[in-house]
């Protein structure tokens, strides 16, 4: 079966499951994330369709995901966690959208966790080294894409005037300094030097 069809089915299934869970599951005291609203589920479905289309220039990315609610952000973080690690572009897109909507401790913790993720060694299988032909700079950046996007979001926050936001952004940079990915180490090192 075509790998793209399998991935498309998986993303669609995730969006349907999220909608079903949002409609059925009550919010519990243990969950820090609020139950997603119907609007949150629509945003997740829209994101799923954009990711399926593989269109990084879809104008909805710049207009439909501003001011995400806590419920939508929780759904997006859930989708990120369910995507295979090899889906670097899709995962990076989710980090990009969440990085534009930083408000809560969970938002910053998510960015820090992405910045410090284990390395993805190959687009075919993150757990296995790539053949030597794949090891040029472009692939190095692609393999580190979600972490680099997290660091760029932190970089934008570092320019903010609010000391509390800068402190939170520093935690993302510090997480990037623990990475084993050369591109992430370079960017986090540059950001750390600028602090």
Language model segments and positions:
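Hydrophobic membrane-insertion alpha-helices, especially the h-region
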Residues: 5-24
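N-terminal leader/linker segments that initiate helical-solenoid repeat arrays
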Residues: 26-62
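Amphipathic alpha-helical scaffolding segments comprising HEAT/armadillo-like alpha-solenoid repeats
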Residues: 31-45, 67-82, 103-126, 163-174
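Short coil turns that connect the paired helices of HEAT/ARM alpha-solenoid repeats
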Residues: 38, 50-53, 81-87, 116-121, ...
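Structural detector for internal amphipathic alpha-helices that build alpha-solenoid repeat scaffolds
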Residues: 49-68, 81-82, 90-102, 129, ...
């Amino acid at each position: 079966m075509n790998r793209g069809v399998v991935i498309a089915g998986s993303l669609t299934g995730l969006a349907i499951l999220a909608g079903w869970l949002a409609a059925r599951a009550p919010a519990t005291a243990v969950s820090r994330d609020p139950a997603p609203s119907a609007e949150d589920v629509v945003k997740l479905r829209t994101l799923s369709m954009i990711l399926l289309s593989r269109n990084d220039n879809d104008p909805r990315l710049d207009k439909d995901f501003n001011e995400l609610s806590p419920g939508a952000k929780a759904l997006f973080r859930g989708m990120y966690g369910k995507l295979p690690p090899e889906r670097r572009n899709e995962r990076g897109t989710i980090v990009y959208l969440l990085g534009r909507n930083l408000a809560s401790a969970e938002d910053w913790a998510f960015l820090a966790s992405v910045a410090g993720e284990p390395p993805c060694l190959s687009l075919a299988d993150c757990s296995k080294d790539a053949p030597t032909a794949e090891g040029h700079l472009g692939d190095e950046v692609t393999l580190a894409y979600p972490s680099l996007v997290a660091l760029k979001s932190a970089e934008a926050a570092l320019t903010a005037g609010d000391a509390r936001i800068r402190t939170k952004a520093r935690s993302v940079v510090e997480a990037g300094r623990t990475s084993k990915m050369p591109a992430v180490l370079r960017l986090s090192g540059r950001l750390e030097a600028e602090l």
